[in-house]
UniProtKB/Swiss-Prot annotation:
Annotated EC: 3.1.26.3
Gene this protein is translated from: rnc2
Name of the protein described by the UniProt record: Ribonuclease 3 2
Record domain RNase III: where: 11-136
Residue ranges constituting the DRBM domain according to the UniProt record: 164-234
Known partners and oligomeric status: Homodimer.
Organism of derivation: Synechocystis sp. (strain ATCC 27184 / PCC 6803 / Kazusa)
NCBIfam families in the record: RNaseIII
Length: 244
C-alpha cells in the first residue's frame, strides 16, 4: 500500500523531529499505522504496534540503565525503569515531539483531556514499534531516545528519596492491572519504646504487596512500596489479586 504524497510528507517531517533523515530506511506504512487511532480505523490501527513498542521502550531503558548504572541492583533498576516507561513519562515525550499533530484520529477523541496521557503514551509506543520493526533493531531509536532516558533516570536518582518507589509501583500496577495500589497507614504503638512513627501496607485489590514503617506517613508508604518492588517487580512475579 502506498501513502498519499501529503501524508508521506507529514511523516517525513515527524522523523526529522527525531533527528532522522528522509532517507532513513523506515517502513512508511508502519509509521502511518503507528499514528492511526482506533476511532478512525477499528481494524487497522496502532494497537499491535503499541504492544511491540512497549517491549522496545523497556529494552531501550534497560540498555541505558545497564550502560550508565551497571552497579545498580536489579530492584533499583526495575524501579527506575517502571518510571521511565510509565504513561506519564512517555506521554511527555510524545508531547515534546508533537505526535498529536500527526495522528489520524477523530476530533472528539483528540479533544478528550481525560484520555490525553494514555493517547500520547500509546501513540509514542506505537511509533517506537514501527521504527523497530522497520529495521529489526534499535538503530533508529537509540540515537534520539537514549538521551531522554538517561536524563530522566538521572533526574529520578537525584530525588531526595533516591527512588520514588510509590510512583514506580503505581506505573507498574497501571500497566499490568489498570488500577492504582492502595496504602493503609496506621500509627505505631506509642506506648512501646522506640515505636514512634507509622506503619504502612500497600494493597493491590485484596492482596498485600508490602509493608514498611517510617517517621512520617509518606516515608512509611515509600518503604512499603519499596518492599513490594523487591518482592514482586524485581523478581518479575505477577500477583493475582481480586480487583473490584
Amino acid at each position: 500500500m502506498s501513502l498519499l504524497p501529503h501524508r508521506q510528507t507529514q511523516l517525513k517531517a515527524l522523523l526529522r523531529r527525531l533527528g532522522l533523515t528522509d532517507n532513513t530506511p523506515v517502513d512508511w506504512n508502519l509509521v502511518d499505522l503507528a499514528l492511526t487511532h482506533a476511532s478512525q480505523s477499528p481494524e487497522q490501527n496502532y494497537q499491535q504496534l503499541e504492544f511491540v513498542g512497549d517491549a522496545v521502550v523497556r529494552l531501550a531503558s534497560a540498555e541505558v540503565l545497564m550502560k550508565h548504572y551497571p552497579q545498580t541492583s536489579v530492584g533499583e533498576m526495575s524501579a527506575l525503569r517502571a518510571i521511565l516507561v510509565s504513561d506519564r513519562t512517555l506521554a511527555g515525550w510524545g508531547e515534546l515531539y508533537g505526535l498529536d499533530r500527526f495522528l489520524w484520529i477523530t476530533p472528539a477523541v483528540l479533544a478528550d483531556k481525560n484520555g490525553r496521557v494514555s493517547l500520547m503514551a500509546d501513540s509514542f509506543e506505537a511509533l517506537l514499534g514501527a521504527l523497530y520493526l522497520s529495521v529489526g533493531d534499535l538503530s533508529l531509536i537509540r540515537p534520539w531516545l537514549s538521551e531522554h532516558l538517561l536524563a530522566k533516570a538521572t533526574e529520578i536518582r537525584q530525588d531526595p528519596a533516591l527512588h520514588n518507589y510509590k510512583e514506580a509501583l503505581q506505573a507498574w500496577t497501571q500497566a499490568h492491572y489498570k488500577c492504582l495500589p492502595e496504602y493503609r497507614v496506621e500509627p505505631l504503638d506509642q506506648n512501646l519504646p522506640q515505636q514512634s512513627g507509622f506503619q504502612a501496607t500497600v494493597w493491590l485489590g485484596d492482596q498485600p504487596l508490602g509493608s514498611g514503617s517510617g517517621s512520617s506517613k509518606k516515608s512509611a508508604e515509600q518503604a512499603a512500596a519499596q518492599q513490594a518492588y523487591q518482592d514482586f517487580i524485581a523478581k518479575e512475579i505477577l500477583p493475582m489479586p481480586k480487583i473490584n
